[in-house]
Every structure is written in C-alpha cells, then in structure tokens.
UniProtKB/Swiss-Prot annotation:
Protein's recorded name: Peptidyl-prolyl cis-trans isomerase A-like 4A
Tagged with keyword Mitochondrion: no
Function per UniProt: PPIases accelerate the folding of proteins. It catalyzes the cis-trans isomerization of proline imidic peptide bonds in oligopeptides.
Keyword Kinase: no
Signal peptide location: none
Recorded catalytic activity of this chain's protein: [protein]-peptidylproline (omega=180) = [protein]-peptidylproline (omega=0)
Enzyme Commission number(s): 5.2.1.8
A cellular-component GO term for this protein: cytoplasm
Length: 164
C-alpha cells in the first residue's frame, strides 16, 4: 500500500496561514489512513474542508476534524459513526505526529490531532497514523492562537484540503 500525502490549506479568521502536507502511514495503518485520506478528498460526500481546529493547547496539540457540528462534539468516519482502533504500533514521538482523537478504545471517527511536542502518555491509547511532511511551522504558528484551557483566540479553519 502506498503512503498517501494529503494537504490542508489553513486560514486564521479567513486569512491564509499556509499549507501543510501530511504523509499517511497506510502501509501499517491502512484503515485509519484511508479514513483520513477520504475525508481530505471528500470522495464519500463529506470532508474536512470548511471545518475548524476547535481545540488548540500550546506545547501539546491542535485538534480538529469535527465537520458535522464544528464544535468538537461531532464525529463521523467513512465507515459509519465510529470504528475500532486498528493498531497502536506508532508512537507519539514529537511535533507533527498525526493521531486520532477518541473517547476511549475503539471510538475513532473523524476527529484528529497534530502533536506539538512528544506526547508519549498517548502511546497505546490513540492511533498515530501520519506525520506532517512539510511546513510543520504552520502547526507551530497555529499554537499561538490556543490557550491552556484548549479554547482558540481566532477561528483556525481548513479552507481547502485534498490529496497530492
């Protein structure tokens, strides 16, 4: 299986911040990577485009992917509402690691987070399935709009997304 690369064009209150590209580890974590890839392209009729990063904690992570309710309470995968943890072999080794947000074991949907630092306490609990390939500095810039309480000071949006 080929490791796909997807992109997010990020805006802050409607103004362009930049494009990040993300390599998905489909060779080891196929189902999770395919869910994220398809939600990036919109080929199943729903997608990340227009959704926001609703939770940003500086020094920890930037979380997004709720394209149904846009507030962190919605979750929808290409497989239905939730799907099982595929495997937990990849580690949260540092900034740029892409991982599934969940509400416990086997509750993956559309929400994801991008690590801003090493987060080893998440190993074995969240499926890490990709890594920012280019422009991790955009993720670092996004951190400036977050607070320790996880709120954001500005609207951080995925203005466009797709697959290279």
């Amino acid at each position: 299986m080929v490791n796909s690369v997807v992109f997010f064009d990020i805006t802050v209150d409607g103004k362009p911040l930049g494009r990040i590209s993300i390599k998905l580890f489909a060779d080891k974590i196929l189902k999770t990577a395919e869910n994220f890839r398809a939600l990036s392209t919109g080929e199943k009729g729903f997608r990340y485009k227009g959704s926001c990063f609703h939770r940003i904690i500086p020094g920890f992570m930037c979380q997004g992917g709720d394209f149904t309710r846009h507030n962190g309470t919605g979750d929808k995968s290409i497989y239905g509402e939730k799907f099982d943890d595929e495997n937990l072999i990849r580690k949260h080794t540092g900034s740029g690691i892409l991982s599934m947000a969940n509400a416990g074991p086997n509750t993956n949907g559309s929400q994801f987070f991008i690590c801003a630092a090493k987060t080893e306490w998440l190993d074995g609990k969240h499926v890490a399935f990709g890594k920012v390939k280019e422009r991790v500095n955009i993720v670092e810039a996004m951190e400036h709009f977050g607070y320790r309480n996880s709120k954001t000071s500005k609207k951080i949006t995925i203005a466009d997304c797709g697959q290279f």
